Amino acid sequence: MGKLDKEFYENKKYHFRYYRKSLNHPFLVAVVIESENDDGKVVLSGFNMTRSIEMVLKNPDKFIRINNPNPEDDAPSFVCVDPIKNKPLKLFTRPIRDWELSLEDEIVIDSLLKERL
């Protein structure tokens, strides 16, 4: 864990949002880490799948799951907060049936998220 990461986890209020791959395969797809800044606004603070998965497993009571806001769409949504407008920002969706992921896919997901930010 780098110095900035260490300071973030020690000094900021934070919570986590996560998605699971599917009902049949409960492994995590991705975790978006958010924190409150000095004004109390929630901002996207970082994304690291491997470390985040470890934190989910160690602290399951601190996590909440966000459901897709569109009930007619069967795709999970990766959502974070736009740090400028402080509004939810929908990054991308993909049908659950297409999620066939392994740990090797985390780099691809990470890249997709960064491209959308």
Task: Please give the residue ranges for each predicted region.
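Short coil-to-beta transition motif at edge beta-strands of beta-rich domains
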Residues: 5-24
